[in-house]
Amino acid sequence: MPPSTVNQEVNSILFIKNLSFKITAEEMYDLFGRYGPVRQIRLGNTVQTRGTAFVVYENVQDARRACEKLSGYNFMDRYLVVHYYNPERAKVDGQDLAARYAALEQVKQKYGVQL
């Protein structure tokens, strides 16, 4: 399928959630590499990002096939959640997170809680 006929939100970068915290990059390459050449995999390594990853494919068609096949796939006793990366959504989520942290700080100050 030519790139011009692919839905605009479909791209070569996938965002994966609900991964086992024990998964390795090698296991990710083995799983996602079944659907085409993978350029890069970034596993979340902080408390907030553990269990997530970004997978970058060489081309959009391979990413699309992986997204279709692996969404809901049971891997390491976890059902994977696979989405196309959306930079606009990432921006909004980050802003919401900052607002939630600010609200949490206000509540902590109000009740004198220190963590």
From Swiss-Prot:
InterPro entries: Nucleotide-bd_a/b_plait_sf, RBD_domain_sf, RRM_dom, RRT5_SRSF_SR, SF3B6_RRM
GO biological process, any: mRNA cis splicing, via spliceosome
Family matches, as Gene3D superfamilies: 3.30.70.330
UniProt entry keywords in alphabetical sequence: mRNA processing, mRNA splicing, Nucleus, RNA-binding
Ranges of residues in domain RRM: 12-87
GO CC annotations on file: U2 snRNP
Keyword Membrane set for record: no
Primary subcellular site in the record, as a coarse category: nucleus
Span list, region Interaction with pre-mRNA branch site: 9-22
TM region(s), chain numbering: none
Superkingdom, taxonomy of origin: Eukaryota
One Pfam family recorded for the sequence: RRM_1
Cystine residue pairs: none
Single GO MF descriptor: RNA binding
Subcellular location: Nucleus
PANTHER family for the chain: RNA RECOGNITION MOTIF RRM DOMAIN CONTAINING PROTEIN
Function: Necessary for the splicing of pre-mRNA.
Protein name as annotated: Splicing factor 3B subunit 6-like protein
Organism per entry: Schizosaccharomyces pombe (strain 972 / ATCC 24843)
Source organism phylogeny: Eukaryota, Fungi, Dikarya, Ascomycota, Taphrinomycotina
